[in-house]
Curated annotation (Swiss-Prot):
Lineage of the species this protein comes from: Bacteria, Pseudomonadati, Pseudomonadota, Alphaproteobacteria, Rhodobacterales
Role summary: RuBisCO catalyzes two reactions: the carboxylation of D-ribulose 1,5-bisphosphate, the primary event in carbon dioxide fixation, as well as the oxidative fragmentation of the pentose substrate. Both reactions occur simultaneously and in competition at the same active site.
Keyword tags: Calvin cycle, Carbon dioxide fixation, Lyase, Magnesium, Metal-binding, Monooxygenase, Oxidoreductase, Photosynthesis
Record-given protein name: Ribulose bisphosphate carboxylase
GO function terms (MF aspect): magnesium ion binding; monooxygenase activity; ribulose-bisphosphate carboxylase activity
Residue positions binding substrate: N111, K168, R288, H321, S368
Binding positions (Mg(2+)): K191, D193, E194
E.C. numbers: 4.1.1.39
Known catalytic reactions: 2 (2R)-3-phosphoglycerate + 2 H(+) = D-ribulose 1,5-bisphosphate + CO2 + H2O; D-ribulose 1,5-bisphosphate + O2 = 2-phosphoglycolate + (2R)-3-phosphoglycerate + 2 H(+)
One Gene Ontology biological process: reductive pentose-phosphate cycle
Cofactor: how and how many bound: Binds 1 Mg(2+) ion per subunit.
InterPro entries, sorted: RuBisCO (IPR033966), RuBisCo_large_chain_AS (IPR020878), RuBisCO_lsu_C (IPR000685), RuBisCO_lsu_C_sf (IPR036376), RuBisCO_lsu_fd_N (IPR017443), RuBisCO_lsu_N_sf (IPR036422), RuBisCO_lsuII (IPR020871)
Site entry (Transition state stabilizer), positions: K329
Amino acid sequence: MDQSNRYARLDLKEADLIAGGRHVLCAYVMKPKAGYGYLETAAHFAAESSTGTNVEVSTTDDFTRGVDALVYEIDPEKEIMKIAYPVELFDRNIIDGRAMLCSFLTLTIGNNQGMGDVEYAKMHDFYVPPCYLRLFDGPSMNIADMWRVLGRDVRNGGMVVGTIIKPKLGLRPKPFADACHEFWLGGDFIKNDEPQGNQTFAPLKETIRLVADAMKRAQDETGEAKLFSANITADDHYEMVARGEYILETFGENADHVAFLVDGYVTGPAAITTARRQFPRQFLHYHRAGHGAVTSPQSMRGYTAFVLSKMARLQGASGIHTGTMGYGKMEGEAADKIMAYMLTDEAAEGPFYRQDWLGLKATTPIISGGMNALRLPGFFDNLGHSNVIQTSGGGAFGHLDGGTAGAKSLRQSHEAWMAGVDLVTYAREHRELARAFESFPADADKFYPGWRDRLQRAA
């Protein structure tokens, strides 16, 4: 059934919809299946996403028609489809009237993903009007709070030197805590890897007790504050809260040095909101493991990593992994830096829409995946700043001299970039950085041709 006479209004102007402030706008790349017209399929998509179905129903009235989602722009050649969703469509809490991200997803990327006349459809951007934006929690904490704990400038404190304890599984509590202590002697921040929790060989309560002790010892030995991101991911809201409360109690006076990691993609919006609301004084670390199933450029359905990041800021993530923008081992490219800008800036341009965040606190980009001291300068050159949390697993513990030296090499790489000094030149007077060249020779040869001769001449 062609529903374009009801669910398509190509006379509507995007600027007018934004000025009106009553619609969430979504931009998709959509292709109909063979034999279906573009506008007809787009209208069916909008109907299925809002008030319609595949037939006219007798219960529809004038009010219902007033909250139809409307296709307002199409470009069949580029496969671009834009839809305006009235804000009245979205579900709100009965306890406080706040917005729910699950409702946003249910409408904009729900049943429409399984429609028989759609070959594929993927959301590439969305715009949230002020009246709806203000109903989301947004972050309560971000990197500025970490800088405060670390004793740095809270406006431009620079890279937080971090790691992920590897191997991601298989370490018992004491070896895990020992690895934490080793890294903390040179670095700032350690995160649980996403599957680490309460395995039978590494009970959470035992591991956390030992990690809290390792933090105290490292702080005493270095005179510097240290940070830990503990995984509280669980299916059950009560389990998440129980883990969080135990962790804070165990860290005691260092409770404000603790972030909570939640696997936000696999657990969904409910887990992120649980952590945000139950623990507003903790940095909420959004890990996105599994997201590539829908965000990868190879996947033509779902939504992009940019959209995932934007949703994370709405929900209240203090930080979210953003990949390495082509500078590490994970899928990505240099142009992905717009994702970081959308997380951190007061207003930012997306692929299709400019979003004003109206004072909503920034979300911190977390950089991980194949990074080491030699790759950092190029990454920072592309991004334009270094106000990120950077976590290197192999880049720290793959250092020939161990985790402490690996941490120091990462810090020295950042220092060199901040000073505008060539990395090989800086390495001549910084042993840990020099040894990073020997630790990662393939990267050294790729990014710094002739490094061996230059370092040997300095020696």
